[in-house]
Amino acid sequence: MKILVIDDEPVVLNSCRKVLEEDGFDVYLVPSADKALKAMKRGGIDLLLVDVKMPKHDGIYLMQKVKEQWPDVPIIVMSGYPTPDTITDGDKMGAAAFIAKPFTPDELLETIRQVIKKEVYHGKK
């Protein structure tokens, strides 16, 4: 499974890469919404981990663009600012799950497993 991680914080990107690669996932890292859209156009991405707060275009903007072109790709929203509005915005845009930063490796993996299980159950993957 190929996971695209989008976050403007290198520490978060590298931490996610380490955890996910150790668990057998193929991981691609990008620091912005624009680069994420370019990566999506190349194809083959199965799941996105998207930070909400990023410069230029935020995660909600990215989710909107992804859902327009790739509606079946599940998106997990990450945020260091888990307000009710952030969660509601993610839900409105079709987020498969939400995870608050900082998160543990186990929390990240469990969230991803739950999303994969839900996608398989609903016949999307």
Where are these regions (language model features)?
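The feature encodes the CheY-like receiver
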Residues: L13, P55, T83
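Acidic catalytic/metal-coordinating carboxylates
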Residues: P31-S32, D58-L62
